[in-house]
Amino acid sequence: MAAQIPESDQIKQFKEFLGTYNKLTETCFLDCVKDFTTREVKPEETTCSEHCLQKYLKMTQRISMRFQEYHIQQNEALAAKAGLLGQPR
């Protein structure tokens, strides 16, 4: 049975998600939308926005992978250190 996440943690995670979403939306909008003379979204604005989002997602994925690799290395180092400390001399 999966453990339930406390409501306060769920709220915190949701607030973090909204903050990230808002920052990404603002960044891509400011980078991609330059002309307000029409109600229509121009093809180049759509393309720019898609590239902006893809770049952000790739960056986030890469950071997550590096973070995971770092933690694996730290755990291995701790395990090796614990193994050395546990051995008689």
From Swiss-Prot:
Name the UniProt key words of this record, in alphabetical order: Acetylation, Chaperone, Disulfide bond, Membrane, Metal-binding, Mitochondrion, Mitochondrion inner membrane, Protein transport, Translocation, Transport, Zinc
- UniProt motif (Twin CX3C motif) ranges: 28-52
Give one GO term, molecular function aspect: protein-folding chaperone binding
Q: Which GO terms describe its cellular component?
A: mitochondrial inner membrane; mitochondrial intermembrane space; mitochondrial intermembrane space protein transporter complex; mitochondrion; TIM22 mitochondrial import inner membrane insertion complex
Where is this protein found? Mitochondrion inner membrane
Q: How does it sit in the membrane?
A: Peripheral membrane protein
Q: Name one GO biological process term.
A: protein insertion into mitochondrial inner membrane
**What Gene3D superfamilies does the entry give?**
Mitochondrial import inner membrane translocase subunit tim13 like domains (1.10.287.810)
* Annotated positions of the N-acetylalanine modification: A2
- Which cysteine residues pair off into disulfide bonds? C28-C52, C32-C48
Name the SUPFAM superfamilies on file. Answer: Tim10-like
| Pfam families hit by this protein | zf-Tim10_DDP (PF02953)
Q: Which domain of life is it from?
A: Eukaryota
Q: In which tissues is it expressed?
A: Ubiquitous, with highest expression in heart, kidney, liver and skeletal muscle.
- Give the record's family classification: Belongs to the small Tim family.
Tell me, how does this one assemble? Heterohexamer; composed of 3 copies of TIMM9 and 3 copies of TIMM10/TIM10A, named soluble 70 kDa complex. The complex forms a 6-bladed alpha-propeller structure and associates with the TIMM22 component of the TIM22 complex. Interacts with multi-pass transmembrane proteins in transit. Also forms a complex composed of TIMM9, TIMM10/TIM10A and FXC1/TIM10B.
State the protein's purpose: Mitochondrial intermembrane chaperone that participates in the import and insertion of multi-pass transmembrane proteins into the mitochondrial inner membrane. May also be required for the transfer of beta-barrel precursors from the TOM complex to the sorting and assembly machinery (SAM complex) of the outer membrane. Acts as a chaperone-like protein that protects the hydrophobic precursors from aggregation and guide them through the mitochondrial intermembrane space.
In Swiss-Prot or TrEMBL terms, this protein is called Mitochondrial import inner membrane translocase subunit Tim9
Q: Which organism is it from?
A: Homo sapiens (Human)
